[in-house]
From Swiss-Prot:
Zn(2+) 1 binds at residues 11, 14, 35, 38. The lineage of its organism: Viruses, Varidnaviria, Bamfordvirae, Nucleocytoviricota, Pokkesviricetes. GO terms for biological process: symbiont-mediated perturbation of host ubiquitin-like protein modification; symbiont-mediated suppression of host antigen processing and presentation of peptide antigen via MHC class I. Belongs to the poxviridae LAP protein family. The gene is LW010. E3 ubiquitin-protein ligase which promotes ubiquitination and subsequent degradation of host MHC-I and CD4 molecules, presumably to prevent lysis of infected cells by cytotoxic T-lymphocytes and NK cell. Binds target molecules through transmembrane interaction. The result of this ubiquitination is the enhancement of the endocytosis of the target chain and the delivery to the lysosome, where it is proteolytically destroyed. This is E3 ubiquitin-protein ligase LAP. It catalyses: S-ubiquitinyl-[E2 ubiquitin-conjugating enzyme]-L-cysteine + [acceptor protein]-L-lysine = [E2 ubiquitin-conjugating enzyme]-L-cysteine + N(6)-ubiquitinyl-[acceptor protein]-L-lysine. It comes from Lumpy skin disease virus (LSDV). The RING-CH-type zinc finger domain is required for E3 ligase activity.
């Protein structure tokens, strides 16, 4: 290192020279020297609003984009689970129709009316239960996707302590 003083004048993130003394947390010595842009990128990547060295909380402001300006990514999406759920939803009406026609012809031969009512109720309710569970699963997957996208579309702006 050139120069006569022993102080480290390099940003601890990008290692470029930095001559301005800013105070974003309680760190001393070389960890105190950091570019504002480098620190903001670091915080936006890690989503950690506290310094890992001194545990001091950064003076930050959250900037949330409006939902219409979000950048969405399929990397948060559980694609196999959503595909299985959509296939179940597509097969649901077909299953109900098959149950209806096959059950009707099968039950015409049975004389006990109470047994017929019980079998009918079970046969019709099972596809409905599967459909309900599938819809709930899709809603949960969409909510998880929303939370991940919301987190990814929030940026932090750091300010110096005064």
């Amino acid at each position: 290192m050139e120069g006569s003083d022993n102080t480290n004048t390099h940003c601890w993130i990008c290692k470029d020279e930095y001559n301005v003394s800013t105070n974003f947390c309680n760190c001393k010595n070389e960890f105190k020297i950091v570019h504002k842009n480098c620190l903001e990128e670091w915080i936006n990547f890690s989503h950690n609003t506290k310094c890992k060295i001194c545990n001091g909380k950064y003076n930050i402001k959250k900037n949330k984009k409006s939902c219409l300006r979000w950048k969405c990514s399929f990397m948060y999406c559980n694609v196999p689970a959503i595909c299985v759920s959509l296939i179940c939803l597509l097969l649901l009406p077909l299953t109900i129709l098959l149950v209806k026609f096959n059950l009707k012809s099968m039950l015409e031969n049975i004389e006990n009316r109470d047994l017929i009512a019980l079998i009918s109720a079970m046969a019709y309710s099972l596809p409905c239960v599967v459909g309900f569970i599938t819809v709930v699963h899709i809603l949960i997957a969409l909510y998880d996707y929303y939370l991940a996208a919301k987190s990814d579309n929030t940026t932090y702006q750091v300010y110096e302590y005064i």
